[in-house]
């Protein structure tokens, strides 16, 4: 029976569908009796499992950079090529990282379900099929329907549990972070290719005080500069680039940025 379940699950995971009742029941039973065997399946077929979502990721990325390219064309009269295989590969690698995460302190069945729903939600948002909130609620409902209400994390070095979040909080962070990081990576590539120096950071109501200090402003990408008599602060310094806790693109950050040209309507 165990061998049959392993064979069945391997096939379903490679096909990218492990959400039906039989799959979840098999995952639960195997995670209780043979968690190492199940983990071995995930690892040995990681490339194939990832490949099942690669096309969806590729299609999503090809549609996600329309605003950046439009701004470049309007501001510089330059029409850049659409997203390349290199950028697509970078984001597919990001999705693979989700599958490979090791700091989720849950039985394998719960971990697999959480990662599956996270990837599904990210794909829905990137393809424009759903808004972030709608995708979030759908993913949360599916997980709660499977009895998963809490997501636990552990320190990968000590093995100790570090924090426990409600599933809606955890999956919201997971979805937003992945989408934002993909978007920022692509934006940086476009700005570099076009030689753009100035960027405008978005703003939104309810921003945390530390983010309100730098949101909605225009910055220079390469140090403090004076352009056409206007002083611009360094973007990465002002917006705390790379600060996971409190910088742009960090945890729970909803800010984005894009090309800016003097005189452009803000």
Regions found by a protein language model. Name each.
Residues 1-148, 263-266:
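N-terminal leader/targeting and assembly helices and adjacent pre-domain segments
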Residues 1-6, 23, 30, 160-163, ...:
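Generic ordered-secondary-structure signal
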Residues 12, 22, 63, 71, ...:
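Arginine residue identity/basic-tract feature
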Residues 34, 49-53, 130-135, 162, ...:
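General structural signal for secondary-structure boundaries
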Residues 124-170, 174, 185-189, 193-194:
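A charged, amphipathic alpha-helical module
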Residues 150, 165-263:
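Acidic, glycine-rich two-metal-ion catalytic cores of nucleic acid-processing enzymes
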